[in-house]
UniProtKB/Swiss-Prot annotation:
Species, as recorded: Homo sapiens
Lineage: Eukaryota, Metazoa, Chordata, Craniata, Vertebrata
Low complexity composition-biased segments: 150-161, 252-262, 346-356
Protein name (database record): Dendrin
UniProt feature coiled coil, ranges: 102-134
Residues with the Phosphoserine modification: 389
Region (Nuclear localization): 113-131
Length: 711
């Protein structure tokens, strides 16, 4: 399609042609496409054309050329054509990895940079002229193009034409490196982005455009495009908006050209995305200096990223990065140029100068240094940037972890330039540049060794503690309701309890809770069971409850309050229903005794379940994944409870418990977790012991029931 030689000639041939023929005759002779291209350059783009941009890039180019002819110049439209070409060109470049002569590309890139500003100015002038001259002089526009081209030619010496042709060329022909477009991109960026483009391109487009436009050297066509990492989580996201603004936009534009030198110096190393991309789209990723990613010099310095990938470069880039920081932040072109020049502005100057967030600045600094040095050793640069340094460069796939610039990160010191012997002073300067708060806390002190600073937040360990196996205690229920961890003798006195006694037992919160849980869960449990249960819990359990569960007596009472209605009389009735429903209290005592055995047999299930539930709740409160305990508890309750009747009370009891317990225990639980584990073990032991004692003392029936329930 395009005449390869013509385009390949680069800025020179188009430039010459433009100069000689004012871009018309010679071009026509050589190629209609070329002619069209010239016209495109000269002619203003109609708004339609930009809309077409997204369409076929090649078609859009050709159509664009024609459109340019057709469409009169628009005030702002001239720039869009380059823009569109950029998009198409960039996209194509992104897809076509062509090997292009690096030297040529670099030369072009430099030309581009120079021409970019000139062309920008020319374009602005042209645009203004057009606006003033008339809405659309598409035909006149052609002559217009001459003047326009002429200034460009004078300024760029073929930059505009070559750029346009090159845009076309990439479309038509992959071989051409993006150098020219990139050079234009600088101008195009300045122009299209600065003035012509109403809005920023999509993220992808921007990456592509910026990468190709801003980074001729970036394209190693023989290699696949570098991995562009997602924004870093580590970087300061606040930097996004900091530098942004007209100034910033301008900076990106200028920086693209200026940055180009760094890139050029660095070789393809530097892919300079529009700084806006770094701040807006990439966010902190723009800051990711160390990676030679597409946008490798994110944020403030174009040079930085690639240099960082190259270890040596990275180290070198520290100083350059400082310069780059300045340039990237304030005036990328100038500062960058300075930095590239080898001015090691970085440590202090860049910190001061860099409008960029502190992070970008330091990184920029590294990179700038790298860029500058990259110039010195371009060959090294490319490979380093493009080829991950075995040591320094973190794997591309894990971009987030080994941030070269991250203090704790693998390449941090290298990035700083420490790796290459950058003195601590450099590091200090760098650190000074960076706000302390931006440094990862752990990394604030430099770690001398290589390594990756990894924060794994996948799981949070609330507490890890050793829980000893519960110690078995013999709990005997005494008629007095006093729990003694003693022999078996008192256990028999339990049956002697009376309803009154059971009521008395209730007063102790633990007893109440225990008895209520027992009663609730066991209609047959009877007051006797309750009283008995209460007694065991009387002193020890009560204490433990307060101490372990952190349940104040009032809370326990609250729990029991609902339970009690069913517990003393109701439960008594329940047991009575079991066999002594209408009996008098005296008779009930007997029932209680009998049931006490049964209740105890049974109680262990609910009682144990209640305790377990409480424990599990506490544990769940601290560790969300211990839900299984509750499920178990529920099953235990249902299994142990005699009837749905019991279950319902159990449920209510459980709920009540939960409310107060969760509320009260959580504060205390946290502090008492260690104690709790022991206490829980103790409680469970007590329960088991109590069950054993009770079972041994109780009826065979009760024992059987207890066994059943425990099973």
């Amino acid at each position: 399609m395009l005449d390869g030689p013509l385009f390949s000639e680069g800025p020179d041939s188009p430039r010459e042609l433009q100069d000689e023929e004012s871009g018309s005759c010679l071009w026509v002779q050589k190629s209609k496409l070329l002619v069209i291209e010239v016209k495109t350059i000269s002619c203003h783009y109609s708004r339609r054309a930009p809309s077409r941009q997204p369409m076929d890039f090649q078609a859009s180019h050709w159509a664009r050329g024609f459109q340019n002819r057709t469409c009169g110049p628009r005030p702002g439209s001239p720039q869009p054509p380059p823009r569109r070409p950029w998009a198409s060109r960039v996209l194509q470049e992104a897809t076509n990895w062509r090997a292009g002569p690096l030297a040529e590309v670099r030369a072009r890139e430099q030309e581009k940079r120079k021409a970019a500003s000139q062309e920008r100015e020319a374009k602005e002038t042209e645009r203004k002229r057009r606006k003033a001259g008339g809405a659309r002089r598409s035909p006149p526009g052609r002559p217009r193009p001459e003047p326009r081209n002429a200034p460009r030619v004078a300024q760029l010496a073929g930059l505009p034409a070559p750029l346009r042709p090159e845009r076309l060329a990439p479309v038509g022909r992959a071989p051409r490196p993006s150098a020219q477009p990139q050079s234009d991109p600088g101008s195009a960026w300045a122009g299209p982005w600065g003035g012509r483009r109403p809005g920023p391109p999509s993220y992808e487009a921007h990456l592509l455009l910026r990468g190709s436009a801003g980074t001729a050297p970036r394209r190693r066509w023989d290699r696949p495009p570098p991995y562009v990492a997602p924004p870093s989580y580590e970087g300061p996201h606040r930097t996004l908006g900091t530098k942004r603004g007209p100034g910033n936009s301008q900076v990106p534009t200028s920086s693209a050209p200026a940055a180009t030198p760094a890139r050029t110096d660095g070789g393809r190393t530097k892919k300079r995305l529009d700084p806006r991309i770094y701040r807006d789209v990439l966010g902190a990723w723009g800051l990711r200096q160390g990676q030679g990613l597409l946008g490798g010099s994110p944020g403030c310095g174009a040079a930085r990223a690639r240099p960082e990938p190259g270890k040596g470069v990275v180290e070198k880039s520290l100083g350059l990065a400082a310069a780059d920081l300045n340039s990237g932040s304030d005036s990328h072109p100038q500062a960058k140029a300075t930095g590239s020049a080898g001015t090691e502005i970085a440590p202090a100057g860049s910190a001061t100068a860099a409008p960029c967030a502190p992070h970008p600045a330091p990184r920029s600094r590294h990179h700038l240094k790298g860029s500058r040095e990259g110039k010195e050793g371009e060959q090294i640069w490319f490979p380093k940037c493009w080829i991950p340094s075995p040591k320094k460069q973190p794997p591309r796939h894990s971009q987030t972890l080994p941030r070269p610039w991250a203090p704790g990160g693998t390449g941090w010191r290298e990035s700083l330039g420490l790796g290459e012997g950058a003195g601590p002073e450099t590091l200090e300067g760098w650190k000074a540049t960076r706000r302390a708060h931006t440094l990862p806390r752990s990394s604030q002190g430099l770690s001398r060794g290589e390594g990756v600073f990894v924060i794994d937040a996948t799981c949070v360990v609330i507490r890890s503690q050793y829980v000893p196996t519960p110690r078995t205690q013999q709990v005997q229920l005494l008629p007095s309701g006093v729990t003694r961890v003693v022999g078996d003798s008192p256990s028999q006195s339990k049956p002697g309890k009376e309803e009154g006694e059971g009521a008395t037992v209730f007063p102790s919160p633990c007893q109440k809770r225990l008895s209520s849980s027992r009663l609730l869960h066991q209609p047959g449990g009877g007051r006797g069971g309750e009283a008995e249960g209460g007694r065991p819990g009387d002193s020890t359990l009560e204490e433990r409850t307060f101490r372990i569960l952190g349940l104040p007596a009032p809370e326990v009472n609250l729990r029991d309050a609902p339970t009690q209605p069913g517990s003393p009389e109701h439960q008594a009735l329940g047991p009575a229903a079991s066999g002594a429903q209408g009996r008098a209290e005296g008779s009930e005592v007997a029932v209680v005794q009998r049931r006490a055995g049964r209740g105890w047999a049974r109680t262990p299930g609910p009682y144990a379940g209640a305790l377990r539930e409480a424990v599990s709740r506490i544990r769940r409160h601290t560790a969300p994944d211990s839900d299984t305990d509750e499920a178990e508890e529920l099953s235990v309750h249902s299994g142990s409870s005699d009837g749905s009747d019991t279950e319902a009370p159990g449920a209510s009891w459980r709920n009540e418990r939960t409310l107060p317990e969760v509320g009260n225990s959580s504060p205390e639980e946290d502090g008492k977790t260690a104690e709790l584990s022991d206490s829980v073990g103790e409680i469970l032991d007590v329960i088991s012991q109590t069950e054993e004692v009770l079972f041994g003392v109780r009826d065979i029936r009760g024992t059987q029931q207890g066994n059943r329930k425990r099973q």
